[in-house]
Every structure is written in structure tokens, then in C-alpha cells.
Amino acid sequence: MVLGLYAFADIAADGAPHLNSAAGEELVRVERAAAVALGSRAPEPPGTLFITTRRVIWVSEVEKGKAYAVDFLAVSLHAVSRDPEAYSSPCIYTQIETEDGSDEESDESDSEVNVETELSKVTEMRIIPSDPCQLDGLFEAFSHCAELNPDPNAESDEENGWAHRDEGDEDMTGGSDAECEFSDVNPIGQTDEHDITHAVVELQINDQRFEDAEEAEHETHGNGH
Amino acid sequence: MPLGQRAGDKSESRYCGVEVLDFPAGEELPAVLSHSLSSSFDFLLAPLVDPDYRPTPGSVLPVAASDLVLGPAQWSSHIVGKISEWIDLDAEDEQLRLDSEITLKQEIAWASHLSLQACVLPPPKRSSCANYARVVNHILQGLTNLQLWLRIPLEKSEPMDEDHDGAKDNSDMSDTVDSWEWWNSFRLLCEHSSQLCVALDVLSTLPSMNSLGRWFGEPVRAAILQTNAFLTNARGYPCLSKRHQKLLTGFFNHSVQVIISGRSNHNVSQGGVLSGDENHTEDTAVRHALSPYLDYIAYIYQRMDPLPEQERFEINYRDFLQSPLQPLMDNLEAQTYETFEKDTVKYTQYQRAIAKALVDRVSDDDVSTTKTVLMVVGAGRGPLVRASLQAAEETGRKLKVYAVEKNPNAVITLHSLIKLEGWESLVTIISSDMRCWEAPEKADILVSELLGSFGDNELSPECLDGAQRFLKPDGISIPSSYTSFIEPITASKLHNDIKAHKDIAHFETAYVVKLHRIARLAPTQSVFTFDHPNPSPNASNQRYTKLKFEIPQETGSCLVHGFAGYFDAVLYKDVHLGIEPNTATPNMFSWFPIFFPLRKPIYVPSKTPIEVHFWRCCGATKVWYEWAVTAPSPSPIHNSNGRSYWVGL
């Protein structure tokens, strides 16, 4: 699979992207007049959004030949955002898994070549439909297609080498059936099936923000009693 | 997103939540969730229902958001439901009580509909919470996947020792607060339901370390860290006291998830914003008010050392109950041998012990003329034979080895090994049970590894007393002695796993288990000791011990689910081998502790000793343990006559 956002060039004369029909790619939803915002950059002028069974493709209507795509396998999170405090326009918010996992965004000049290089580093993308009423439908389409693309890196149940006795009195068996049942559920807070092993809260461990405070002496005495 | 990437840690404590304090009305919930997720939080603790709602006939529940606004996957993965805090099922006011019951059931039903994994129940409002527990117990019996987390503030006031006056003692008693007691009352009333768990509210002050330790044996799922618990460092950023840091690390190591709650008390500016770039400023998302607290929590997580390799290997066995091996009655499988043979630390200790014995036995002057006769009884597939020959080579002593093994399958492997290593002239294989074999000569040294997690529970005494016939009167046995130990523990999870079998036999069985979510309540004490050679080999190996455990006063009251068992062995002189926590041999993995459960957990009030009795009983065909608590309240004698658990001779 391809990680990250990439430029898409395979566009037909009518403005629709050519799908990889041989690989079973199908069109699920089309959204006209949808803008996209990459990372913290300003939104691009409206284009057309195509959601397929494998990826999200956005084709600019203003700039001929300009289009972006991202595979669903690289979309680690999608959500509806309506809070003006979070973002000025209602939109679909997505997080994109990149190759190096870096949140670093360069401030390089806006030349064509650099823009293309930058695409693979984008980790957040917002899709802003001109009609906010379409958000729920878009979210549903996203969810449907995400389910069609389960994470191949999902943890497999490797059998541990530890000895387990199978013979002997069945009543003596330890362990619990409830254990197996519970462990099938994703932990609370984990995003869908994508366990992003390299996307974590980024910190500098020696950051001075995290220095200890001077702890009051009376507190120490109080705890000692 | 996860707080950090710690090698080997796949637990849910990597995911941090945030509490939503104001009811997200008018479909605000998706926006709040989106904002929190984009700020690196992983889930919300959010009210499900408008707190102003009171039930009236025909009214529709005013929910935060319907299942059309957020899909089931979002609800399940990113929302922990908060049940309305006004609910008070033990209120004096009858209308409030009835409204509370109706609403609690409605909210739980709604949470189940949404496929939430967990809901947080409001804390008990007074020490008496019988009606609250009754309603919750009723609900629990109908749940399948939903967990209920009872919110409990982490507090315990310390009794004043100066008051010796009787009248003041009574007054003081009523003033003493220990929130663990609230939890204990509630879960007892709810019959120790496995779906009833704890969400601890962590405040600015913490009880004593011993008191905190109790919670690690309880089903704590979340620690709700109040912003008021944070201090301010010299740079104006939030941070935690050293004691809070230590507690937090303990939570991370026990799969407890952190939820940050409260208003921001620290206004730290975002230095990185390019204020000059008007376009950039406009598009930057507003930073979450609680992000500085999350950053600090992530800092604490990322500062932790990676899990040791051995811990990573064993992590899947945490709190997993296993039946102990029966090597005397059953023939072990190749996989079992393979696993135990990888424990290089164990065989290093044996090699050291054998080397010392060889040097003591044969002086340097007699090296060239004296051959030591060594018998490995219970040779298995040969690791002790290898350790013995390596010890001989290392010390320059000459050795004649007899490898005695009763498992015919292991004997086949032994033959291959000896041919492979070219040990034909040094090693004689005896395919026989050591209890029946007649040795052609007496041995100087007898080596065995018949030890179980409790020392003698794999019937090492019976085997070695039987093998003593082979030993010269002044001969050496390795091990020369071993002792078992126990300590009382709180272990909610183990109790619930055993209870799931719904019979007495499972509560009268000892289990081998890698203990993890437990509270060790008092220091270990020794139970049984066996010496080899046995000065009185014909004496019985029956034993009886009575022990008294004093739990430190500052711990407070606790619940004892059973006893953790360990062993320590003296292989030879100062060479030890064991798993007793205070003297455990590092990096060894051949043994997990043993757990002796109690049928009914026993409540131990503060300052009250525990009295426990252990018996080791011997019959013609089996050996078994019996155990019972007699104080503070008597339990049945467990495993009477070996009816549930025994070790076959």
C-alpha cells in the first residue's frame, strides 16, 4: 500500500478519475464543489471529491490536472467536525498515516516540485463540502470504505511457546473463557483497527516544560503521619 | 493518539481520555470529540443525557447525540458514558430516589444500545449505599459487554493516634474516611460482579503508599486525574508531585487509563504560533485547553523504561491461571522440556552449586586419582547432565554420571544427546523411576530439579527421600533444602476468573499464575521446609503450620482473596535459587508463583491480624494441601482430604 497523500494524474476528459477496475476499485460517492485543506494550509478552491472502495481522490476544478489521492489504508482516522472552535467550516477531518510518521511541515517556497514533495508529509486533511448537510453522508461513505480496508498490520494471535497442558482432568483447567471474549474488543481510545505504532504524542523528553515543581515541605510532613 | 511508543506495551493505558464537564447539547458531541481527537486525546468521558432531565411519562430521553450522529464504532472506541451525577438512590427524598432509579436504568439502556464499552457511575454519596448497589446489581445481571466503572475519590484520612480517650475514639471513628471501604461495600453488595470496576478520582493529596497499593489488586480501569492535582513548575507549566508521578507509573504498568478532568489552571501561551502570518493564524486549530496536561502525562509515559525482554515474553501470561505440572504422575511433553531448558539462569546456578560441591568433595591434591560419582535423578532431556559435566570441566574434577529418568520419551532424547556430545564414557542412562531403581554404587552427589512453585509441591521430598538410598552417608544433595512462603493478597481478577467456573473445586485448587494485578498485603512468611539428605528419611513428609500476618496500620482495611505462594531453595551452601519476592533469582522464568484462593474473600479490618493454617497431607497415592483462615473470621478448611486438588505419587 501507499502511505500518505500523493498527486493523482490519471484523470479522464470529463474530469473523473480513472479507477483501477482490474483491482476491483469501485466508485462509492461523488461530492461536487468540495474544498480540501491540507494540514494547516488554507483550503484549496473547490473541486470534486471521489470516494472509491480503495481511496479518496480530490480533483481540482480550477487548476486542470491538479488532483490528490490517499488510500484508505493510510487514513487512520476520520470524523465530522462542526465546532467552529476546532475549524472555521464544518468539514470531514482526517488523519493520514505517512511514511516517516513525522509531523514536520516544511516552510519551503511554493514551487511546483516542492508542493509535490510536501504531499507525502501531510498528516491532516479536511474536506469542506459547500453544503454542510452532506457531512453525514460523507462520513458514512468514509466509514463504509474504511471497513472495506482493514489494517493488514493488525496484531495476529501468535501462539506463545509456553507449555500448556491439554491432558489431565478437565476440571483442573485454569484460565477463563471470559478472558478470550474480552480481549477481542479494541481498547477504549484505539482508533478503529489501525494501531498506529509510530504516530504518538510528540514530545522532547528533555523539554523544560516538564520540570518538577518545588514541593511544599508541609505536604511531605502531612503524608508522613 | 497513543501517549508514546514503549516496546512491548500493548495495553490500553497508552490511550488517554478527557472528561466533558458541560453537557454537549444540540449535537455538539461530534465537534467536541473531533476537537479532542485532533488534540491527541483518544476518548471522551461524556455525559450521555441532559442533567436537567427528570423522568415524566412518555418523555423522550434528551441524549447528547443519537446513533445517527455518531456511528457505533465511534461510540464504542471513543466515548465512555458518564451517568448523570444528580442520581442519588439512597436519598431520603422518595421522589428523588425513584427518579434516580428510572433514569439510571434508562441511561444504561441507552449506553448498551450505543455499544459503549464502559460507563462511569457517580460515586456513592454516603457510606450507606445499599439501594444504589441493589439497582446496579440488578442492571449488572442483564449486561453482556458494557462495563460499569464506579467513580471513587482516592482519599483516606489518617486516624489520629494521640486520642486514647474512649469517647474521642468513637468520634474519631465516625470522622475517618477511607474510600476503599465504599468500594468494598458496593462490590460485596453486587456479588463481586466482574463487570463492576473502579474509576479512581485522583486528587491533590494522596493516601499512604501502602494504602494506595490496595488498589492494584482491584479492578481499576481508569484514573481520573483532576487538574487541581497538578502543581506549577518554575516555568508556569503543569506538573505532578513525585508521589503522583510514581502512582501514575504504577497505573501505566497495570493497564489503567488516564482521563484528564477539570478546568485549566495553567494559561501557557503557544510560543510556536507565527503571529505575523495572518493567514496561518486564521487556519490554526484552537489548541485544547487541557493539552498542557496531556503533554505532561505523555512525558511521564515516554520517560518509562521499555519492558524487559523477559517481561515481554511473559506478558500474555499475566494473571492467567494454570494448573501446576505433575511431572511425577504424568510424562512431560517435549515442548514443556524445551521451554524450561531455555532458562539459562537456573542451570547456571546449578552449575555453580555442583562446582562448589565438587571442590568441597575432592581436594586439589586428589584430583587426578579420585572420580566423583554424581547422579542426576529426574534427568529429563539432559540439562542437568550438561551442567554437571561443565562444572567438572571447569573445576578439573573427574566425574561419573548416572542419568536417571522415568519418562521413556525423554530417555530417547537423552540417548541422542549423549551420542551427539560424545559423553558415552562419562554418562550412564538409567531408564527407571528413581523410587524403584537399585543403584550399582553409591553417589557422592545427588542432583535434581524436582522443585515446584511452592518448593515441595511437585513431591520433591518423596522423590529425594526415596533416592537417598543411592547417596553415601556423607554425600551431598543439590538442592540441600527448600522452603515455601506465603503472603495474603488482594486479587479481584483471579477471584472472578475462578468464580466463573461456578463450583467449589476450582476454589480449592492451587494455581500457577504470573501475578500482576494484585496487592501484596503483608511480608511473606515461611511455611514448610525440607532438608536433603533427610536426617530422618522414614519420617513422614506431612506438615502443619499456623501463621499470623499483621497488615500495616496505614494500609487500612482490605479484602483477602487468597495467598500467593513462593519458594526459595538452597542448592548448596550460598548458592540459592528461588522466586520468593525478597530473594528472587533475577531473570529466571521456570516458575511463576502459586495462588491458593479462598472460597469467600475475607474482609480484614484495619489493625486486625490474619491467622491462616496450612497443612501438607500425604496418602498412599497422593499428596495434597489444605488451608483455612481462622481470623479475623473463619473460612472453611479448603480441599479437605484432597477432594479438589492433589498431586499424584
UniProtKB/Swiss-Prot annotation, chain B:
Sites where the protein binds a protein? F340, E449, E458
Active-site residue numbers? E449 (proton donor/acceptor), E458 (proton donor/acceptor)
* Residues that bind S-adenosyl-L-methionine: Y337, K346, Y347, E405, D433, M434
Which reactions appear under catalytic activity for this entry? Answer: L-arginyl-[protein] + 2 S-adenosyl-L-methionine = N(omega),N(omega)'-dimethyl-L-arginyl-[protein] + 2 S-adenosyl-L-homocysteine + 2 H(+)
Task: Note down the stretches annotated as region TIM barrel.
Answer: 10-300
GO annotations of cellular component type: cytosol; nucleus
Give the primary localization class: cytoplasm
Q: Which UniProt keywords apply?
A: Cytoplasm, Methyltransferase, S-adenosyl-L-methionine, Transferase
The keyword Methyltransferase is assigned to this record: yes
Q: Where is this region: Beta barrel?
A: 479-649
As recorded in UniProt, its EC number(s) are 2.1.1.320
Query: Where in or outside the cell is it found?
Result: Cytoplasm
Keyword Cytoplasm found: yes
The record's section on InterPro entries has:
Arg_MeTrfase (IPR025799), Arg_MeTrfase_PRMT5 (IPR007857), PRMT5 (IPR035075), PRMT5_C (IPR035248), PRMT5_TIM (IPR035247), SAM-dependent_MTases_sf (IPR029063)
Which Gene Ontology BP terms does the record give? methylation; regulation of DNA-templated transcription
Q: What does this protein do?
A: Methylates arginine residues in proteins such as histone H4.
Q: What is this protein called?
A: Protein arginine N-methyltransferase 5
Q: What is the lineage of its organism?
A: Eukaryota, Viridiplantae, Streptophyta, Embryophyta, Tracheophyta
